[in-house]
């Protein structure tokens, strides 16, 4: 691409229109994130949930606006090759001083891909690789603030860190909170080290808001040691603020950013700076996952696909049919050397599935819009994804031709998949249980029931609750990942099975009672879930009430009253109110 910049005024005008479209998108994105602080202060929890749900649509709305503008003002379909080449160069020039160049490049790609034929997707017209560096972009306010405990003491420094967030709601007892923070840190590190000359605490400027909690994210640096932390701040029952816990293990902070959780609301002028800081405390987190959890899902998808293509260049294994029981709706395949599964909607569903392709897509979108409470796997959705034909095992190609012929094409040396979902690979729960000892079975079944309970209180009914539709994560958490029958709890009708008019009817092949499309009889769960003796024993020990319609009806009643359950992305025993409860109890008795 050797055309010089500045020769094509049409390209210059289009580039300006494109950046205006992106800037509008990011302005709305930041306004939504800024309002999260106000909602947190006012305890408007539903507003937080609504903001996350609505934000999912922002990007596509702005892309569609930009596409319409390019068609109406510039007759985009008739642009020649020279103009497309100049357009990218002009756009790069605009981005040289931009605060979000990587996001703006992705926006450019999204707009162009709606206009260009896909044969152009990997050429010089698009950003196949980043063109503008995201290193050292200046920001005001800065990405993070630095505090120096040598100057004013550790206790005063911790107080100032918290007070600098300027929440317009008082703390119930900030001195007590600081005591708890310092005690938890002391117990974690064992002994206070001497302060080195570089001793400092770096804290990301914006708090991270999700549901009812605000998180202060940072790290302490002392000599060659770094100590990451995430401080959770919540409202107490009286409506005042209090520090709920401080997470100090990097893996626990990583769980906070799990894709099975709702996205954060964070006000960022320079998102790449936030991602860079977060990776310094969670080096095993991919940048694509961090962008996604910050609400920048399209950027997460862009970076994920670049990582996948890079992995394919440096590996030689083949895509194969995923192990486990085949699904009735999805064809699932995987690349053994890459920790993800790829899901394609079949052309024809199993006989028991009364739905169409549009319904399935709507259910997967629903999962992105709700609070996943750590129990629903997030998905990346792609259209016209090109993967190398040579990497597809012949059995997988045969399966694609037989079950999803309308969903892919072979063009040259590429397989073009027209619509694709990608999820983190997990161990299917049914396979986990087959190889588990008694203790592992009890743990997994308890986790399974807890997942169902937490989803229910978050207004999510899984629908198909077979063990094969749940997976076990690398942290041992049970997560649901089959969404074609998922529904809102409030849409369901949970019923008890009525008595049989005659005893012999209980032995009949067909039920003696009628059932509507949204009717659920929890008593029936035992029939298809509890066939294995070890599983049955553990389930009845921990979750017998899930077989009673009353449990489900009570949860529905709570949801309809507007009650929002508390979901903690960390063990409740790590909450300050529980960590030293025995000592408080003894002190109270002594008094």
Curated annotation (Swiss-Prot):
Catalysed reactions, as listed in the record: L-seryl-[isocitrate dehydrogenase] + ATP = O-phospho-L-seryl-[isocitrate dehydrogenase] + ADP + H(+)
Signal sequence segment: none
Location of this chain's protein in the cell: Cytoplasm
A cellular-component GO term for this protein: cytoplasm
Organism domain of life: Bacteria
Role noted for this protein: Bifunctional enzyme which can phosphorylate or dephosphorylate isocitrate dehydrogenase (IDH) on a specific serine residue. This is a regulatory mechanism which enables bacteria to bypass the Krebs cycle via the glyoxylate shunt in response to the source of carbon. When bacteria are grown on glucose, IDH is fully active and unphosphorylated, but when grown on acetate or ethanol, the activity of IDH declines drastically concomitant with its phosphorylation.
Protein name: Isocitrate dehydrogenase kinase/phosphatase
Underlying gene: aceK
């Amino acid at each position: 691409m050797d055309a010089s910049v500045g020769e094509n005024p049409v390209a210059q005008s289009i580039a300006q229109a494109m950046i205006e479209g992106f800037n509008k998108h990011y302005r709305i994105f930041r306004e939504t994130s800024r309002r999260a602080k106000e909602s947190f202060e006012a305890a408007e929890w539903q507003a937080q949930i609504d903001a996350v749900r609505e934000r999912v649509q922002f990007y596509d709305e702005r892309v569609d606006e930009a596409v319409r503008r390019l068609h109406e003002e510039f007759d985009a379909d008739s642009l020649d090759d020279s103009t497309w080449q100049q357009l990218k160069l002009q756009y790069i020039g605009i981005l040289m001083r931009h605060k979000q160049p990587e996001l703006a490049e992705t926006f450019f790609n999204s707009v162009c891909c709606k206009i260009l034929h896909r044969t152009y997707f990997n050429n010089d017209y698009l950003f196949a690789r980043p063109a503008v560096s995201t290193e050292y972009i200046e920001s005001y306010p800065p990405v993070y603030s630095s505090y120096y405990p040598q100057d004013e003491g550790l206790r005063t420094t911790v107080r100032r860190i918290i007070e600098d967030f300027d929440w317009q709601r008082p703390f119930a007892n900030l001195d007590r909170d600081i005591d708890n923070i310092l005690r938890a840190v002391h117990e974690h590190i064992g002994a206070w080290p001497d302060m080195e000359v570089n001793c400092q605490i770096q804290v990301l400027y914006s708090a991270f808001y999700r549901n009812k909690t605000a998180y202060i994210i940072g790290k302490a640096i002392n000599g060659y040691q770094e100590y990451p932390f995430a401080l959770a701040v919540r409202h107490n029952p009286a409506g005042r603020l209090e520090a709920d816990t401080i997470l100090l293990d990097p893996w626990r902070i990583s769980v906070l950013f799990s894709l099975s959780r709702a996205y954060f609301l964070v006000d960022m002028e320079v998102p790449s700076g936030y991602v860079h800081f977060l990776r310094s405390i969670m080096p095993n987190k991919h940048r694509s996952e961090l962008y996604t959890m910050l609400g920048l899902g399209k950027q997460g998808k862009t970076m994920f696909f670049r990582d996948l293509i890079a992995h394919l260049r440096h590996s030689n294994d083949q895509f194969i049919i995923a192990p486990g029981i085949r699904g009735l709706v999805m064809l699932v395949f995987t690349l053994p050397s890459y920790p993800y599964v790829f899901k394609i909607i079949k052309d024809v569903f199993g006989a028991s599935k009364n739905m169409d392709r549009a319904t399935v897509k709507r259910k997967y979108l629903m999962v992105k819009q709700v609070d996943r409470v750590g129990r629903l796997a997030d998905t990346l959705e792609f259209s016209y994804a090109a993967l190398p034909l040579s990497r597809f095992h012949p059995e997988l190609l045969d399966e694609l031709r037989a079950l999803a012929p309308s969903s892919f094409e072979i063009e040259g040396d590429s397989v073009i998949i027209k619509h694709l979902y990608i999820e983190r690979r997990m161990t299917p729960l049914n396979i986990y249980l087959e190889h588990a000892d008694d203790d592992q079975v009890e743990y997994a079944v308890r986790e399974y029931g807890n997942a169902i309970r937490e989803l229910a209180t978050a207004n999510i009914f899984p629908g198909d609750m077979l063990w094969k539709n749940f997976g076990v994560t690398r942290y041992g958490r049970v997560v649901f990942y089959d969404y074609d029958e998922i529904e809102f709890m409030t849409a369901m009708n949970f019923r008890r099975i009525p008595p049989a008019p005659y005893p012999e009817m209980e032995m009949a092949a067909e039920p003696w009672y009628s059932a509507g499309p949204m009717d659920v009889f929890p008593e029936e769960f035992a029939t298809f879930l509890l066939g294995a003796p070890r599983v049955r024993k553990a389930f009845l020990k921990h979750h017998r009430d899930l077989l009673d319609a009353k449990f489900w009806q009570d949860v529905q009643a709570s949801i309809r009253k507007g009650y929002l359950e508390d979901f903690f992305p960390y063990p409740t025993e790590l909450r300050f109110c529980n960590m030293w409860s025995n000592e408080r109890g003894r002190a109270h008795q002594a008094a």
